[in-house]
């Protein structure tokens, strides 16, 4: 299965009539492996900050997490495995696997829990596959 298929069929899937605003699978260096049509472009320093937060949980909490210049307030995640952010009526979930970052961005009416479920389910599957 291609990385694009994972994005199109597993991340951008419909859940209770809603779907993510955008999604992507990236390498730990920020290289895009696959993305939805309107996924924002991460800046290199944003990826560096995100990877540092996975290594040093809480690193982004004082400043917030930036994605394509948009600031997200970091909310409780799973140290070293999942970072979650909130911005207005939407937010972001990033799941780290051995080789990739699985990213989902949502807006209302999708809920944070629905975004978490979609992103983390695929991330957990990739971890099980050694990815």
From Swiss-Prot:
Q: What does the subunit comment say?
A: Occurs in many kinds of cells as a complex with monomeric actin in a 1:1 ratio.
> Where does it reside?
Cytoplasm, Cytoskeleton
State the name under which the record lists this protein: Profilin-1
User: From which domain of life does this come?
Assistant: Eukaryota
Q: Which GO terms describe its molecular function?
A: actin monomer binding
Other notes: The variability of the residues taking part of IgE-binding epitopes might be responsible of the difference in cross-reactivity among olive pollen cultivars, and between distantly related pollen species, leading to a variable range of allergy reactions among atopic patients.
What is the gene name?
Answer: PRO1
Give the species this sequence originates from.
Answer: Phleum pratense (Common timothy)
Spell out the GO cellular component terms annotated for this protein, sorted alphabetically and separated by semicolons. Answer: cell cortex; cytoskeleton
